[in-house]
A protein has these predicted regions:
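Extended, charge-rich helix/loop segments that form flexible
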Residues: 104-164
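A short, basic-hydrophobic beta/loop patch
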Residues: 23-29, 33-40, 47-86, 92-95, ...
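Exposed alpha-helical structural elements
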Residues: 137-140, 166-169, 173-176, 246, ...
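Extended hydrophobic/Leu-rich segments
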Residues: 1-7, 25, 36, 43, ...
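Amphipathic, charge-rich alpha-helical segments that serve as recognition/docking helices
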Residues: 240-278
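Short alpha-helix boundary/capping and kink motifs at helix termini
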Residues: 35, 42-43, 48-49, 143-213
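Short amphipathic alpha-helical segments that mediate assembly, nucleic-acid/protein binding
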Residues: 16, 20, 28, 118, ...
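Boundary detector for helix-to-coil junctions that initiate low-complexity/charged tails
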Residues: 1-30
Length: 278
């Protein structure tokens, strides 16, 4: 069993190192993609070979997403989405990886998940609602101003809140997003600009067939939960090794067939309200 832990403060990577790792990941994934040509037979042979390696996370997510495209998107009730997975992790006290880079994973994920309702974003939105969206009166706004004045600014969505304009902009975008989702719901990723923060809401399926939220899209998920939306679009981007092997054995499927079967099972399991669940 792999040991998976969150990074300690002194182990966290700089932004530059994260960018370098991301570019290397994209290059490797592109080479594999071109080699496979997304032929079903080659695809299953490649995935089988990766499954036989002793690694905790494997097969680049972009390979799977390029093959299945929109087939990985389902609609779920956000009431079921209660846990976040961390992004940068340490495996067996040596390898530092980003969980979002890989479509399959192994090991125990309990130590790398956290409650969405205890997240800063969730608390920010409750705080905003308590002051009727008058963000300059909110506790978090005042806290970020105080940190700015002490030369210890907060970073939100890859932006440093080191000026009043930056802090105001963050809260104004948050409120605009809240109002948009309240009016239109959560839109699919292909309905807006291809920006990093507008990627589809990614979810993972653990060894028990339960869903967790992948890093990113925190504001959209929190807003949808607090607004009690009935459904939101999400994209399956990580599946536990034990669960897909269980589905393969149960239904006598190859890897590609098992992925689509899991998509179907997750849609059936998580699209209805909990009160209607049998």
């Amino acid at each position: 069993m792999f040991e998976i832990n969150r990074l300690r403060k002194n182990e966290r990577l700089s932004y530059r190192k994260k960018v370098i790792r991301y570019l290397i990941y994209k290059l490797k994934a592109r080479v594999i993609f071109l080699f496979l040509k997304i032929n079903s037979k080659l695809f299953n042979l490649y995935v089988k070979k990766e499954f036989n390696k002793r690694v905790c996370f494997f097969v680049p997510t972009t390979i799977i997403c390029s093959k299945f495209k929109k087939d990985l998107t389902i609609y779920i009730n956000p009431e079921y989405l209660n846990l976040n997975l961390k992004d940068w992790l340490k495996v067996d006290e040596k390898s530092i990886i980003n969980i979002s880079y890989y479509f399959f994973g192994d090991g125990n994920w309990e130590n790398i998940s956290s409650d969405i309702s205890k997240s800063i974003v969730y608390k920010e939105l409750l705080d905003l609602k308590n002051v009727n969206m008058d963000y300059k009166s909110s506790k978090h706004y005042l806290s970020y101003v105080q940190k700015m004045n002490k030369n210890n600014p907060t970073t939100k969505q890859h932006k440093i809140l080191n000026t009043y304009e930056a802090i105001d902009s963050y809260f104004e975008r948050f409120i605009n997003l809240y109002n948009s989702i309240k009016e239109k719901g959560v839109l699919k990723a292909d309905n807006f600009k291809k920006e990093k923060e507008n990627k589809a809401i990614g979810i993972a399926v653990n060894s028990n067939g339960e869903i967790l939220k992948l890093p990113g899209a925190q504001h959209r998920v929190v807003i949808s939960k607090i607004l009690n939306l009935e459904k939101i679009p999400v994209e399956i981007r990580l599946i536990h090794k034990e669960y897909i092997e269980k589905i393969m054995n149960l239904y006598n499927l190859n890897y590609d067939g098992a992925i689509l079967k899991i998509v179907y099972l997750m849609q059936e399991k998580y699209q209805v309200e909990k009160s209607d669940k049998r």
